[in-house]
Each structure stands twice: as C-alpha cells, then as structure tokens.
Amino acid sequence: MEQTVHVPLGARAYDVVIGPDLVAQAGQRIAPLLRRKTVAVLTDETVAALHLEALRAGLAADGIEMEALALPPGEATKGWPQFTRAVEWLLDKKVERGDIVIAFGGGVIGDLAGFAAAVLRRGVRFVQIPTSLLAQVDSSVGGKTGINAPQGKNLIGAFHQPSLVLADTAVLGTLTERDFLAGYGEVVKYGLLGDAAFFDWLEENAPAMAAGDMALRVEAVARSVQMKADIVARDETEQGDRALLNLGHTFCHALEAATGYSDRLLHGEGVAIGCALAFELSARLGLCSQEDPSRVRAHLKAMGMKTDLSDIPGDLPPAQELLDLMAQDKKVVDGQLRFILARGIGAAFVTADVPSEKVLEVLQEALAHTQPA
C-alpha cells in the first residue's frame, strides 16, 4: 500500500514516503541520515499527547534517543515568541550541524520547525513527519518554512528542503472531522489547478476516503504530493509555475486576516472557499463556463465542507476592506495583485490582469449572501 514520491531537486532531492504505520518505523527510516543516534523533536501538545510515545518507540527500535519540545497547538504558535523558544531549546540541547531536527505535527509545526532548522547554526537538516492531512499534502513538501508577522502570514521565512518526509496515513485517523476536511481543501486544489482526471477521481472516491478507506487515503495523498513535487521541481522558489499552488489563496489569506487567524476559519477551509471564489471570478471574466464553479461548490458541499462566506461564523468586513487585505498578499508584484484563475477544472494559470472592480463584484455578491434576509 505504501507509495514513495521523489522530489528531484539535485543535491537537495528527497523522498516523501506515504503509507500507514510509518511512525512505528521512524527509526529505520531516519537512521541512514544520522551521524549520531539522537534527534530533537519539535511538536505540539495535542500531537504529543496522541502520538509522541509511538514516535519514541519507533525511534528506540533502532536505538535512537529523542528529546522533544511540545509547543501550544494552533496558528498563534507560528510567531516570534514560540519560534525563539524553539531555537533556544535546540541550542540548549546542543543540536549540532550534523544532527537532524524532526518536525512532528501539522502545518504550523512543520513551518516553524523547518525555519528553526534553517537558521540554527546556519542550517541543520530536518525530517518532516506531518500528522495532518493538510501538512501531508501541502506544507511538508517543497521546503517553504516560516512564521507569521503582525503584518501578515508567512512573511518571515526561508526555503529549506527537508531530508525526508514520512506521511503516516494511519495518524490521520485521530484528526477531527473538521481538521480532516480542512486538509481536504488542499487535496481538491490539486485537481482544480492541474488535473481534471484527479478531480473526477475525487468526486467518485473522496467520500469513502474521508470515511476511512486507507488505500484511498494513500492514493489521494500520493497523487497530491506527486503533483506538488512536479511543480516544485520546475520552480523551487516561486518565480513562475509554483504560484499555481496558490489557487484560492489570495482570497483565503484575506479571509484569514479578516477573521484574525482564529479558529473561525481554518487555512484549508479558507482555501476551499477561495477556490470556489476563484472559479466564480474566472466565470465572471468569461474564462470558464458557469458550470465549473457550480461543480466545485457541489463537490465541496457533498463533502460537508465550507463553501461560501456565509459558512464563516461571525461578521466579515465589507468587500473593499477584503480587497485591501488581498493587497497585503506576498503575491503582489509591482503593486499588482496576482491571481490564479482557471480556464476550466484542471486548467489554472497565473495572471496579474484582473480588474479590481470585478473582484469587488464577486466579493460583494458573496457577502450579500451572508446578510440575514
């Protein structure tokens, strides 16, 4: 059932191994990378309570000792205070340049631990063991690491590729339904941006996958990772094609900022809503048929996901304010907002040529549905 996706980046190439029970095999998988039989693990309190002893046992099976620091769970951890704490802890533990740091958690831990590894002693190697669906299909692959600033998400960071990624699909069984579906937002994104056949496959198989079918989970993660690996190999530092991976993210980042990066909206939920809005905008601009956004929404709804602004609890700011938040996005070039739009399902492209009044129209219409009648 296990699948391996190779990320071909020359001297920085690595494998992403996908399958059940990889945490139990962590020792034998990581041992070839080690110069001495000890590792430092960064995790969060939720993951630690559920899985840290299993990781300790998996490492001990190969005679590897581990020390672990568990940070508070949640997006708020991804800032200077906890980052400083993590780096100083790694220094206290005398992590050397030849050692390995393990990122054991979801996207927040992966981003923070990867960035800590990137700056520690000017760069130590790290291994990703992503525990959420979102991290397995997205943030653990591709080497983007970083933390948030008061001015916006992911504005402080570095490109630092992992040495190995172990995506244990059995661990996904401990996710809440909400977290699993939030991660699924990123899975759908891959079908929407470049693989119509994968989107067809998801329409047919995703309900059974969400219900727990392990072979389908491995397949969905592997296909997502393969697609990301192909794009990252073509464009590691996001000069061109890699921007396609941001489908739905320009809307998403504005919505996350508007909701204060809180639990009102999880990142993957924002991506799903953002993808629906990006297709809506594409149809509005005459790039794709109106059937495409309808099909996107129908699938997200069938999966029980957030699809509209009205699905976000609480009040949202007016359309112009959301548009202003979009301008804070990292994808701004020469003051122009870059959007990822679509000529159809599986046919996304990057453009800066989007009239802001059209974006405003789509936002105003989406917000109109949130007002109580």
Swiss-Prot record:
Out of the domains of life, which is the source?
Bacteria
Q: From which source organism is this entry?
A: Ruegeria sp. (strain TM1040)
For this protein, the record's HAMAP family field holds: DHQ_synthase
Q: Which reaction does it catalyse?
A: 7-phospho-2-dehydro-3-deoxy-D-arabino-heptonate = 3-dehydroquinate + phosphate
Q: In which pathway does it act?
A: Metabolic intermediate biosynthesis; chorismate biosynthesis; chorismate from D-erythrose 4-phosphate and phosphoenolpyruvate: step 2/7
- Cell location: Cytoplasm
From the Swiss-Prot or TrEMBL record, give the protein name: 3-dehydroquinate synthase
Q: Which NCBIfam families match?
A: aroB
Would you kindly state one Gene Ontology biological process term found in this protein's UniProt entry?
amino acid biosynthetic process
What Gene Ontology molecular function terms does this protein carry?
3-dehydroquinate synthase activity; metal ion binding; nucleotide binding
Query: So where does Zn(2+) get bound?
Result: E186, H249, H267
Query: Which SUPFAM superfamilies did the record assign?
Result: Dehydroquinate synthase-like
Cofactor binding note? Binds 1 divalent metal cation per subunit. Can use either Co(2+) or Zn(2+).
